[in-house]
Amino acid sequence: MPRSKRSKLVTLAQTDKKGRENKERIFDEVREALDTYRYVWVLHLDDVRTPVLQEIRTSWAGSKLIMGKRKVLQKALGEKREEEYKENLYQLSKLCSGVTGLLFTDEDVNTVKEYFKSYVRSDYSRPNTKAPLTFTIPEGIVYSRGGQIPAEEDVPMIHSLEPTMRNKFEIPTKIKAGKITIDSPYLVCTEGEKLDVRQALILKQFGIAASEFKVKVSAYYDNDSSTVESTNINME
């Protein structure tokens, strides 16, 4: 494995003591991992939810996943050729964007590729993303799944949620015979349109987790050859 370049003084952005200590800790962890593992992969984890992140960490328990401020990760790798910790790492640094995670591992390349190519989890839609489906609440009694399953397999939405449906979600509901009802079908969203906060909350209220979360993997660095290889997994 190639030796690291001579240590240089790297200045991190000025911040409060606690914040600076955290940046220095992450910086040191990255440098230590670079000297420990053969490969480092760049993962893009925008919109990742905590349970999903925990699952990924568990799956790679024998490896090390480091997340931190993009700038801190870039400085640890080296933003420029003359600052890089190891040969050609500055090329990997350029690929850090958004919410970045660095996966350090000795697992072979194909194992890592196949894991992330096949890793897909259902997720609730977020605001400003495209609606995964057209969703209309049927007229009559409002059920907990909003008509996604037969009424005989569902239960009416609890009446205490009626003010939320009417005031927060702006759905024209009312209480009739102790149950939440609407007089006509209510269109929540159309497939492909951009969701606002209200629409995303309604989909979640009705248990619609029709979106998919995939980890984007742009490239990896091989310590043995000092090369960066593009992967473009889920980068479309």
Curated annotation (Swiss-Prot):
Associates with the pre-60S ribosomal particle. Present with 18200 molecules/cell in log phase SD medium. The lineage of its organism: Eukaryota, Fungi, Dikarya, Ascomycota, Saccharomycotina. One of its GO terms (biological process) is ribosomal large subunit export from nucleus. CDD domains: Ribosomal_P0_like. Gene3D superfamilies: 3.30.70.1730, 3.90.105.20. GO terms for cellular component: cytoplasm; nucleolus; nucleoplasm; nucleus; preribosome, large subunit precursor; small-subunit processome. It comes from Saccharomyces cerevisiae (strain ATCC 204508 / S288c). The gene is MRT4. GO terms for molecular function: large ribosomal subunit rRNA binding. The keyword Isomerase does not apply. This is Ribosome assembly factor MRT4.
